[in-house]
Swiss-Prot record:
Alphabetized UniProt keyword annotations: DNA damage, DNA recombination, DNA repair
Organism for this UniProt entry: Salmonella dublin (strain CT_02021853)
Coiled-coil residue windows: none
Swiss-Prot/TrEMBL GO biological process terms: DNA recombination; double-strand break repair
Keyword DNA repair belongs to the record: yes
Family recorded in the similarity comment: Belongs to the RecO family.
Quaternary context: Monomer.
Origin superkingdom: Bacteria
InterPro entries: ARFGAP/RecO, DNA_rep/recomb_RecO_N, NA-bd_OB-fold, RecO, RecO_C
Name of the featured protein: DNA repair protein RecO
Amino acid sequence: MEGWQRAFVLHSRPWSETSLMLDVFTEESGRVRLVAKGARSKRSNLKGVLQPFTPLLLRYSGRGEVKTLRSAEAVSLALPLSGITLYSGLYINELLSRVLEYETRFSELFFDYLNCIQALAGTTGSPEPALRRFELALLGHLGYGVNFTHCAGSGERVDDTMTYRYREEKGFFASVVIDNNTFTGRHLKALEEREFPDVDTLRAAKRFTRMALKPYLGGKPLKSRELFRQFMPKRTVKMKKD
């Protein structure tokens, strides 16, 4: 694509002595694989530009699976993620790299991604609400349509006090059994509205998105989750000392 378009780098790795292989998420073309020739050389004006969470304008060309980056400019400084928000950002980057096919347009998802990164950069509390909203948006764009407001069995609106079990591709059915795969009507309404007023609804949202994303991710664990697990004990120890 010869024209300029907005983009973010999801991941990069060395490619030859002076170049980079990039996995980028673009507004118009979706996920694209690019070679940035000379980007690692000392004199490259791309040094420090092709970083995750930096809003970019870029141009590329080529007809194969791997395109060639022609030029790139940072629209602004990288969004300031650190600590837990940095690991959260790495998680959604890896999520996109795992579930999106190359060169499939997801313009609305691009802005959901931007909104999530901005929310992470601006939060002073837990990143969990922003992550759950993004996961739900991603599932919607992947065609994973779920009716959170009505019981799939009776067709009636869900009741806050009742329990429902999710059946893949069918929806939520009333259930007398309560376990890790069931949700209350209150949980389902929170998922529909994407508002999580307390720890209980946040945990329920995390259970659902993990369940729903599993078929897309397969059996291979996410590296960012492992990094996050390693980070959390250190963070807990530091908080106790403080």
